């Protein structure tokens, strides 16, 4: 993926702001809808975590570093991979919209990722975020509304 327009995905969720925040920042919940191999996570500036995701023959060691936290409103983290150059910032913003909660996720490329790797094509990145935010997270929230 290259430094161009960020990928932005929005989703209305049938949950409170607090419940959405918990789903986004509590590692037990994150493992159920996001990445099941996340070893740990804390919504704290400076917190770092690392985990491996394999896709066929390729490995992607994810490195996250939390860069901004506004509880129940916003969390950002810097995202790199050990195996490949490139870096991005993922921003999750939540707000109230009538009786629902609006989640806006933005993935911004800071330094280009290799374009010859299929997982780094813009279409692949957009499809991944669409799946996570519009399918996986809402299903988790529907099943676990009282978590």
Predicted segments with their positions:
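Extracellular beta-rich ligand/substrate-recognition surface
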Residues: 1-4, 52-56
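Hydrophobic ligand-binding cavity/cleft-lining segments
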Residues: 1-39
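Residue-level preference for beta-strand/loop junctions
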Residues: 4-5, 45, 58, 86
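Generic structural detector for well-ordered beta-strands
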Residues: 8-14, 42, 52, 65, ...
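Hydrophobic pocket/interface hotspot
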Residues: 20-21, 30, 49-51, 66, ...
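A solvent-exposed, acidic/Ser-Thr-rich amphipathic alpha-helical stretch
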Residues: 37-47
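Hydrophobic-ligand binding "helix-grip"
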Residues: 40, 55-102, 108-112
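A conserved amphipathic terminal alpha-helix motif
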Residues: 109-147
């Amino acid at each position: 993926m290259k430094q161009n327009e960020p990928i932005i995905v929005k989703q209305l969720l049938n949950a409170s702001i607090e419940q959405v925040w918990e789903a986004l920042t509590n590692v037990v919940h994150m493992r159920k809808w996001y990445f099941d191999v996340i070893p740990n996570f804390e919504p704290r500036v400076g917190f770092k975590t690392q985990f491996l995701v394999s896709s066929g023959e390729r490995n992607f060691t994810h490195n996250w570093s939390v860069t901004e936290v506004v509880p129940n409103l916003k969390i950002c983290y810097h995202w790199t991979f050990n195996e490949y150059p490139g870096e991005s910032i993922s921003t999750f913003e939540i707000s109230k919209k009538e009786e629902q909660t609006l989640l806006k996720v933005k993935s911004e490329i800071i330094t280009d990722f290799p374009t010859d790797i299929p997982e780094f094509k813009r279409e692949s990145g957009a499809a991944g975020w669409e799946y996570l935010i519009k399918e996986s997270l809402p299903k988790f929230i529907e099943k676990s509304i009282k978590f």
